[in-house]
């Protein structure tokens, strides 16, 4: 399929790597094949929608978060920047479109998704032929300029989850239009062909023709002006007839006498003229019948005194190729019913996915609350254990103080008991010493 049949829109990215300008990537968008997908991508390139879902709906400032050499580079996550976010201009996601297009060459622009009918804002640019993605991802454009920039991004060093180590950012983006479309807007009305196949100057002067053309507002205004002009001409003719009526009545008598004289001269020729007139009249009737019975090119019989002849040249635009393709897609009742069933099944799957996602979110929220409660219980338990340990330590310290005080009291009692004993023992010692001295005296006396 030639490029002009696939589409005629252009978009561009200005890329920077680690803050340094790397170049521009220009895309050719296939708006005739995938109009909804192209409009989604184009709106994010221009940023014309402003803020949506709390984020600025534009690729400007977003990054290429995933790079796989020999496969593709991926970007377009305008919310999180890591491949988990993004949304479409039609809502959260939108359905797949024209999955018959193949990934049969490198540097194609395709939509990233998380399954059937989950397209958002993320996209990827292939660097090789990837037939295993056919029927799963929607191809809606190709790179026509800036292949070297794509190769430079592809050859960058990557880390965890194929994220490039260097920051690859879209610093500027937008839609490209042809210079003729911009310059020619001022004179578009003058240079634009008339919207009908019949021009006003081509119309016959008689009112006994059946004309078919689209009644645009301009043609209605011109018709009103022509009607007003015809009325003025009719009034002028009526006034001139009134003015010259008297002269005609005065000349009518002389003209009637002249006609009577000429009638006698023509009497010999009446036979021949009558036959010729009858032949001419019959020929005109046959031609008129032929014109009446002749249908149009489309096979439609037109009421009136003649067939359409003032069609003019083909100045209108040709039928777009995507219209022709749609007109050629005539479906049978069974095919239409099958398509409706597929659409219903797709809607059911989408509803089921939404339901599962809601259940998953509810489950995650419940688990989060349970984990929070569990952490709170563990914290309370730890505080209770610390309080119990503190109480036990206080009790042990009190017991130690009591034992220490009781031990010191018993020692004091023992010391008090020992002092009287010492006092009682000292007189005994003195008496024993005196007795020993007396015994020694007695022994000396005996000697």
Curated annotation (Swiss-Prot):
Biased composition (Basic and acidic residues): 215-234, 255-301, 323-399
Superkingdom of source: Eukaryota
Region (Disordered): 186-447
GO biological process: protein folding
Ranges annotated as biased composition (Low complexity): 432-447
Pfam family, one: Pro_isomerase
Regions annotated as coiled coil: 326-401
CDD domains associated with the record: ATP-synt_Fo_b (cd06503)
Entry GO terms, CC: catalytic step 2 spliceosome; cytoplasm; intracellular membrane-bounded organelle; nucleus
Biased amino acid composition, Basic residues: 235-254
Keyword entries, A-Z: Coiled coil, Isomerase, Rotamase
Function recorded in the entry: May catalyze the cis-trans isomerization of proline imidic peptide bonds in oligopeptides. May play a role in the protein folding, transport and assembly.
Family: Belongs to the cyclophilin-type PPIase family.
Protein name: Peptidyl-prolyl cis-trans isomerase 8
Provenance organism: Caenorhabditis elegans
């Amino acid at each position: 399929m030639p490029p002009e049949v696939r589409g005629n829109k252009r978009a561009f990215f200005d890329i920077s790597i680690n803050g340094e300008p790397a170049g521009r990537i220009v895309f050719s968008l296939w708006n005739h094949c995938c109009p909804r997908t192209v409009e989604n991508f184009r709106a994010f390139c221009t940023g014309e929608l402003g803020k949506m879902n709390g984020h600025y709906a534009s690729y400007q400032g977003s990054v290429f978060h995933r790079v796989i050499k020999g496969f593709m580079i991926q970007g377009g996550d305008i919310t999180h920047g890591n491949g988990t976010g993004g949304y479409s201009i039609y809502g959260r996601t939108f359905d797949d479109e024209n999955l018959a297009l193949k990934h049969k060459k490198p540097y194609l622009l395709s939509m990233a998704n998380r399954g059937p009918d989950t397209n958002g804002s993320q996209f990827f640019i292939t660097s090789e032929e990837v037939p295993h993605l056919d029927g799963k991802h929607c191809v809606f454009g190709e790179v026509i300029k800036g292949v070297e920039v794509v190769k430079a991004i592809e050859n960058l060093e990557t880390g965890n989850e194929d994220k490039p180590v260097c920051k690859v950012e879209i610093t500027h983006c937008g839609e490209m239009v042809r210079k003729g479309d911009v310059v020619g807007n001022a004179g578009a009305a003058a240079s634009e062909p008339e919207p009908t196949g019949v021009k006003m100057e081509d119309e016959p002067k008689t009112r006994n023709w059946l004309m078919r053309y689209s009644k645009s507002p301009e043609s209605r205004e011109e018709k009103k002006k022509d009607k007003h002009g015809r009325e003025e001409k009719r009034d002028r003719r009526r006034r001139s007839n009134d003015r010259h009526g008297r002269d005609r009545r005065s000349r009518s008598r002389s003209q009637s006498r002249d006609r009577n004289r000429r009638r006698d001269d023509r009497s010999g020729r009446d036979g021949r003229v009558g036959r010729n007139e009858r032949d001419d009249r019959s020929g005109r009737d046959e031609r008129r019948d032929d014109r009446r019975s002749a249908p149009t090119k489309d096979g439609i019989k037109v009421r009136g005194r003649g067939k359409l002849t003032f069609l003019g040249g083909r100045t209108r635009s040709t039928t777009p190729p995507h219209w022709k393709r749609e007109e050629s897609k005539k479906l049978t009742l069974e095919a239409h019913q099958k398509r409706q069933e597929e659409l219903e099944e797709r809607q059911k799957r989408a509803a089921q996915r939404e339901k599962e996602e809601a259940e998953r979110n509810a489950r995650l929220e419940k688990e989060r609350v349970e984990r929070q409660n569990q952490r709170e219980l563990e914290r309370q338990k730890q505080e209770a254990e610390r309080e119990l340990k503190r109480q036990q330590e206080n009790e042990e310290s009190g017991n130690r103080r009591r034992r220490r005080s009781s031990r010191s009291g018993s020692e004091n009692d023992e010391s008090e008991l020992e002092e009287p004993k010492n006092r009682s023992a000292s007189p005994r010692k003195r008496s024993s010493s005196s007795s020993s001295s007396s015994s020694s005296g007695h022994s000396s006396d005996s000697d």
